[in-house]
């Protein structure tokens, strides 16, 4: 009989992750590798990718490769997929964590800081990256039948948080895209959202999040730690969620259900 814990293992599977840096992406990449997956991590910053890759390979026997990409550019995503296949073969898991287009309304700019350029970046990175990676990996997933695409959602996709309007609209559209892909790509590929709240923000982001009272507006009344999204990311990646698709798993401290 298969152990319950074995359903969470990812041995021999290959995972592509975007937006990997200090925070949720790094923790998820390390968790997938620890559970047996080959991981291909990507972000815009080569320096942080080198550090994370070295740490994974030192611990997990050389199952990580890094690729510097802009998730909003199709040609970069094509290169990411090609690199993953060249190193590890067919792709099983896509974890879409890259995000862009967040406007904080500095210096009184407010909603009009959502320029055409901001709108384009938000839609390209937050929405189209999921669509493009689904298209680019669907042949692999259709063949082996164990595909899992996970897109990181935001509380901003459920309720308006001005002035981050372009970001919120792109995340709301992502919800519909994920449900549509889940129906279209079943049964060989499952597609789900992971809604992540304010996870240990730092620097300017922390100041803004505190100013908005985001920690106080969720049920648990604190910011999350970056590793608190890992359990849900593991669940959605493998056989433990084999009957789950078109869904959203929430790791946001109860904020979506309680926000004013």
Residue positions per predicted region:
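Short C-terminal tail/terminal secondary-structure segment
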Residues: 2-7, 159, 234, 245-260
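A glycine/serine/threonine-rich, flexible loop-to-helix segment
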Residues: 3-6, 54, 108-109, 193-218, ...
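Conserved glycine-rich cofactor-binding loop
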Residues: 14, 19-23
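Substrate-binding pocket helix/loop in short-chain dehydrogenase/reductase
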Residues: 105-111, 115-120, 214
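Active-site helix of classical SDR
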Residues: 134, 170, 178
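Residue(s) in the substrate-gating loop at a strand-loop-helix junction
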Residues: 154
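Short, small/polar-rich loop/turn modules that mediate ligand/substrate recognition or access, typified
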Residues: 186-190, 244-246
């Amino acid at each position: 009989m298969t152990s319950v814990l074995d359903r969470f293992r990812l041995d021999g599977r290959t995972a592509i992750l975007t937006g990997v840096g200090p925070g949720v992406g790094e923790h998820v990449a390390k968790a997938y590798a620890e559970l047996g997956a080959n991981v291909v991590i990507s972000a815009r910053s080569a320096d942080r990718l080198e550090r994370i890759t070295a740490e994974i390979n030192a611990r997990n026997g050389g199952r990580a490769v890094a690729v510097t990409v802009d998730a909003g550019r199709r040609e970069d995503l094509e290169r990411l997929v090609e690199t993953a296949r060249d190193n590890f073969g067919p792709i099983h898991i896509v974890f879409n964590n890259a995000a862009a287009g967040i406007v904080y309304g500095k210096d009184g700019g407010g909603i009009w800081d959502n320029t055409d350029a901001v709108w384009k970046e938000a839609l390209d990175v937050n929405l189209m990256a999921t669509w493009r990676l689904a298209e680019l990996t669907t042949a692999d997933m259709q063949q082996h039948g164990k595909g899992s695409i996970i897109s990181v959602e935001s509380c901003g996709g459920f309720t308006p948080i001005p002035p981050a309007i372009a970001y919120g609209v792109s995340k709301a559209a992502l919800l519909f895209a994920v449900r549509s892909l889940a129906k279209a790509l079943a049964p060989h590929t499952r597609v789900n959202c992971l809604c992540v709240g304010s996870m240990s923000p730092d620097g300017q982001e922390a100041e803004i999040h505190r100013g908005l009272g985001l920690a106080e507006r969720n049920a648990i009344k604190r910011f999350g730690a970056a590793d608190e999204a890992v359990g849900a990311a593991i669940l959605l990646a493998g056989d433990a969620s084999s009957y789950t698709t078109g869904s959203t798993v929430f790791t946001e401290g109860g904020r979506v259900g309680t926000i004013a």
